[in-house]
């Protein structure tokens, strides 16, 4: 970089050349990448006007590339509620490389498919999860809890949607947003099942908590990273507008390949004042390789069995904060049905429910919840996995 006069060369150290953004490419052979779809994250601290100007420029660049390379939709989603400004869309390779080289951009990465983390379905199996988290010893089916039961706390179910009219939810469930299609109902059942665990009348932990459905996954239980980022941003904005930051919980029974933007938005949501319970994943491997389980500031949950062992499908590792029941868990399904599922998807809502329960009972804030859960937990898990906690969720019932 040169200047007209040597007298002002000192400015080079004070104002270095603007740095281009980082282009993060998918690993060779990756099967979860959405073709020609990208997530663009802006530099921290960028102003709203500069962000808008950048998007206008990106749209212009995309329009030029469409004339040469075919149809690419360009910018499709934008977000900023968590403090991470960015957008997603479909771009030609030439265009996305120009975007990545823009000095306002921090990084660009591929958009990916994300899936629910349920594992096995078995009908008519017995329940043990509620009894297990409220008794220090296994074998007791009685669920023991304070009558406050999460009253005044809101839990966001970021999932396939929720059957909000199911009698299990007693009118406490409302529809929030849909970031994947135009069908405002749970087409899969997974989201209704997890909501039944964290706040259902019969199957739930926090039986008086409010429930908000945030649909980011389709009938097959799949969605995009960008859609989930939009859903998380919606939750933060909703909590802020309703003055419940610090008194809100988010259940994320989903996950995919480790993604920087996914982890960043999850961390930002936690920092904003929402307690995040996150499924560790069902690949039987280190959860450090998955998102958002590897995000800082979230409470990452592995799945235990009725025998207090790690479920063989459950991910493990140093990023895991707690174990919770996740094998053979019964709960509700759409259209007044019931279903038994297994997976870290079923473990995470136990933790979301206990988080809401403790926030209501003890008056603690969202940022204190995960550490409180870990302090109350019991050292019960046998063979938890390499570098993994052996602590099992417990609601401090005293029994």
From Swiss-Prot:
It comes from the Eukaryota. Residues 21-117 form a propeptide. GO terms for molecular function: serine-type endopeptidase activity. One of its GO terms (biological process) is proteolysis. PROSITE patterns: SUBTILASE, SUBTILASE_SER. It is an enzyme of class 3 (hydrolase). The keyword Protease applies. InterPro entries: PCSK9_ProteinaseK-like (IPR034193), Peptidase_S8/S53_dom (IPR000209), Peptidase_S8/S53_dom_sf (IPR036852), Peptidase_S8_Ser-AS (IPR023828), Peptidase_S8_subtilisin-like (IPR050131), Peptidase_S8_subtilisin-rel (IPR015500), S8pro/Inhibitor_I9 (IPR010259), S8pro/Inhibitor_I9_sf (IPR037045). Residues 1-20 form the signal peptide. Secreted subtilisin-like serine protease with keratinolytic activity that contributes to pathogenicity. GO terms for cellular component: extracellular region. The lineage of its organism: Eukaryota, Fungi, Dikarya, Ascomycota, Pezizomycotina. Transmembrane segments: none annotated. It is found in: Secreted. Keywords: Glycoprotein, Hydrolase, Protease, Secreted, Serine protease, Signal, Virulence, Zymogen. Residues 127-399 form the Peptidase S8 domain. Its EC number is 3.4.21.-. The active site is at 159 (charge relay system), 190 (charge relay system), 345 (charge relay system). This is Subtilisin-like protease CPC735_033790. It comes from Coccidioides posadasii (strain C735) (Valley fever fungus). Residues 37-116 form the Inhibitor I9 domain. Belongs to the peptidase S8 family. Glycans are attached at residues 115, 251, 395.
């Amino acid at each position: 970089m040169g200047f007209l006069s040597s007298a002002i060369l000192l400015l080079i150290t004070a104002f270095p050349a603007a740095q281009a953004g980082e282009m993060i490419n998918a690993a060779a052979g990756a099967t979860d990448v959405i073709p020609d779809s990208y997530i663009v994250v802006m530099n921290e601290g960028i102003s709203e006007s500069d962000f808008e100007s950048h998007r206008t420029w990106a749209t212009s660049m995309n329009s030029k590339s469409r004339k040469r390379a075919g149809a690419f939709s360009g910018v499709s989603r934008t977000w900023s509620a968590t403090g991470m400004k960015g957008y997603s869309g479909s771009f030609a390779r030439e265009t996305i490389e120009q975007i990545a080289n823009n000095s306002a951009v921090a990084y660009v990465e591929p958009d990916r498919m994300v899936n629910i983390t349920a594992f096995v379905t078995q009908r008519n199996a017995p329940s043990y999860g509620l009894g297990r988290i409220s008794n220090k010893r296994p074998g007791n089916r009685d669920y023991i809890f304070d009558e406050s039961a999460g009253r005044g706390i809101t839990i966001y179910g970021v999932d396939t949607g929720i059957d909000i009219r199911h009698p299990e939810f007693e009118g406490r469930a409302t529809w929030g947003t849909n970031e994947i299609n135009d069908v405002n109902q749970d087409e899969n059942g997974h989201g209704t099942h997890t909501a039944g665990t964290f706040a259902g009348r019969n199957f739930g932990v926090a039986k008086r908590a409010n429930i908000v459905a945030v649909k980011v996954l389709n009938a097959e239980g799949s969605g995009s990273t960008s859609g989930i980022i939009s859903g998380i941003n919606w939750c933060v904005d909703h909590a802020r507008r309703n003055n419940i930051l610090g008194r809100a919980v988010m259940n994320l029974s989903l996950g995919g390949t480790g993604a920087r933007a996914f982890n960043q938005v999850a961390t930002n949501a936690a920092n904003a004042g929402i307690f995040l319970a996150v499924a560790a994943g069902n690949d039987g491997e280190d959860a450090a390789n998955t998102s958002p389980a590897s995000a800082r500031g979230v409470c990452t949950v592995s799945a235990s069995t009725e025998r207090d062992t790690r479920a063989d499908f459950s991910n493990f590792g140093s990023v895991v904060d707690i174990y919770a029941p996740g094998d053979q868990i019964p709960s509700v399904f759409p259209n007044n049905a019931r279903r038994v599922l297994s997976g870290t998807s079923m473990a995470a809502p136990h933790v979301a429910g206990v988080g809401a329960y403790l926030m209501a009972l003890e008056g603690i804030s969202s940022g204190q919840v995960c550490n409180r859960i870990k302090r109350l937990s019991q050292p019960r898990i046998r063979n938890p996995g390499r570098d993994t906690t052996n602590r099992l969720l417990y609601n401090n019932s005293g029994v």
